[in-house]
Amino acid sequence: MTRKIMLQGTGSDVGKSVLVAGLCRLASNHGLSVKPFKPQNMSNNAAVADDGGEIGRAQWLQALAARVPSSVHMNPVLLKPQTDVGSQVVVQGRVAGQAKGKEYQALKPSLLGSVMESFEQVSAGADLVIVEGAGSPAEINLRAGDIANMGFATRADVPVVLVGDIDRGGVIASLVGTHAILPGDDRRMVTGYLINKFRGDVTLFDDGIASVRQFTGWPCFGVVPWLKSAGRLPAEDSVVLERLTRGGGKALKVAVPVLSRIANFDDLDPLAAEPDVDIVFVRPGTPLPDDAGLIVIPGSKSTIADLDDFRRQGWDRDLDRHMRRGGRVVGICGGYQMLGSRVADPLGIEGGKREIEGLGLLSVETEMAPEKTVRNSRAWSREYDVALEGYEIHLGKTTGADCSRAPVEIDGRPDGAMSADGRVMGTYLHGLFGSDAYRSALLKSFGIEGGGGNYRRSVDAALDEIALELETVLDRAWLGTLLG
């Protein structure tokens, strides 16, 4: 029989995704067939699953940790925010429509069937399924029709382990408070809790464990230290971008404007892992640095709205100065679209303006269309004559004179555009920098030798290190029950 456990957080960004990935790798290392599952995710960092269709990037990573092919059923409902109040709704890998907050609350109950169908698919043949919740079950205002936390756990009869983040402070109050406000049926699903991101002498929290036990009756299944290896894993949520920014006199500074609806910013992770590269994620209200050698404009869930914001920040003027200083620019997906002379949305797919003037660094134009391209791709860099692997997730078609200098071939067809002087290029291919040979060639073009280490191997090693750490610190009896 398949064993099942669900990690739910006392809040967002408590580290659930990393813990699920670590537990998946730990179980796999013990010879178990283990699979991850997240009923509902909200993220613009999407991946293309091995069976086609979109899932959250975290579930793709968790499948990698579990050493199993990724599937759209591992994340049956994916919400991709397009505006401050609305999201694109992806169900079992395919776009099902768009919904604003209240509309989605009404829609949720109808999605439970798809969620349960996917859960059955994932569970089939697995020894263990590790489920990740979303946000917190303490948000009882969202409990009606819930499919992400306790609504799913009670329906699927999956025991819950709460995760509290001690690094942000108030972890005892968050655990006890969650116990206090959960309805009785939900509270009974909780079997215990984990403390995450602890720094220092773990015995200093012994009294804390006793206090939580006194108020809730819940046992502690482990105090997990701050996992340094997690810094080598792709991040899923834009709330962590400040922590990803590096700085300090490296050979190459790469500036990345943080767009309001930034998508797939984990494209930059392989560059950030390079010892001679500084990645600077530039928040709104801050100019693009004048000492950057390369500016990367990342993907966007709403290209036209983000291009409006780009100008509002004055980043277009910063970009012009960067070009006059001899700098280089790469645009990926939505960032590529922005680099052209015009972006048109005649059908109103993005829900805002129908047309906007582009940044004018490439002689191309983009027109949005309802057909969405979602696929894993094998590609070739014409620029550096090396093989690439990546994926495409985009709406729209880009055409123009600079497309004649396409920097990439995807499955044998030209993709992207490059300026005549070679300093500006754009492509729809995500994962470009994750190809070691391409990254090495790019760094050499900036005078950096020795780059392009095996990024995938580094991620895999980080997962093993996290699994080993968890095996050391987690309660042995609980872990034994989990692993069988």
Swiss-Prot record:
Give the organism, scientific name: Rhizobium meliloti (strain 1021) (Ensifer meliloti)
One matching Pfam family, short form?
A: CbiA
InterPro entries, alphabetized: Class_I_gatase-like, CobQ/CobB/MinD/ParA_Nub-bd_dom, CobQ_GATase1, CobQ_N, CobQ_synth, GATase_3, P-loop_NTPase
Question: PROSITE patterns, per this entry?
Answer: GATASE_COBBQ
Gene3D superfamilies with a match to the protein in the record: 3.40.50.880, P-loop containing nucleotide triphosphate hydrolases (3.40.50.300)
Q: What is this protein called?
A: Cobyric acid synthase
Q: What residues form the catalytic site here?
A: C333 (nucleophile), H430
Gene name of the encoded protein: cobQ
Protein function: Catalyzes amidations at positions B, D, E, and G on adenosylcobyrinic A,C-diamide. NH(2) groups are provided by glutamine, and one molecule of ATP is hydrogenolyzed for each amidation.
